Amino acid sequence: LRFRVVEEAFKKKAVPVERPEERPSEYFAKYVFNREKMFRYLPRKTYDALVDAIDNGKPLNREIADPVAAGMKKWAIEMGVTHYTHWFHPLTDGTAEKHDAFVEHDGKGGMVEEFSGKLLIQQEGDASSFPNGGIRNTFEARGYSAWDPSSPAFIVGDTLCIPTIFISYTGESLDYKAPLLKSIDAVTSAALEVCHYFDSRVKKVYSYLGWEQEYFLVDEGLYAARPDLLLTGRTLMGHESSKNQQLEDHYFGAIPTRVSAFMQELEIESLKLGIPVKTRHNEVAPNQFELAPIYEECNLANDHNQVIMELMRRVARRHGFRVL
């Protein structure tokens, strides 16, 4: 079976990639509610308050939530979106989302598109099945997702994804974003005290993150022939190859044609989601590759890393690969 699968894998050709007619700078952040879209779709007073909250950490007034939600909904519907979700990072090494449609009863037997500030700011969901580190009983099921305005909303398919934190009903963090935001605030406070020794006009310290994503690409046929990969997503049996991390000739080598097509489509989709991908190359081990973006503000960079890992899985399937 394995020899036949390997033979079939060598016969596969690269999937053609449709490149947009525009330059990357023109379609960058096409599916992101960034400041350009905020300025176009929000009242000026609301835009200024939201930017002040993002840049300076000023608390948001609940009164601006309704115009923000209205502007966000208008843009999303124009982009063909039908649903929205509070998107967060539970303690499962992935992302979580629950999709709700932009529909409510209109009181006349019909439906109307609706998205209020209340729905934007906070939602209550079932948190009983998420890992919690033993901080609560399983019957205490309520969890709350709260909007993080410092990370812009984005569109995936027909869904508007709104980055949020996720906490239990007693206030404990049930995700990775809330502790990250707290640590960024702590670093900012400590760094400001040092900066004020040199310049009292310093008001904010920005934490930047330059991540890189290494990954392995495995042909779908070979992947399906390995029960350990199917069940766990990693190798648990078999012998190591004679050379793995010692393959210096593979590092920075010519990128295989099928892999190059995968990388091209991944970069196009990443740029549309506002992820500034810049570098791609072979890594050391067989079938190991790497992608790296331009560094960004820490919270945004972390969200982009989560988005791109999910994006890699989807794009890989279209090219006959599975990503490890």
What are these regions (language model features)?
Residues 2-21, 138-152:
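N-terminal hydrophobic targeting/anchoring segments and the immediately downstream early-domain regions
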Residues 140-324:
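Glycine-rich, acidic/polar active-site loops that bind/position phosphate-bearing ligands
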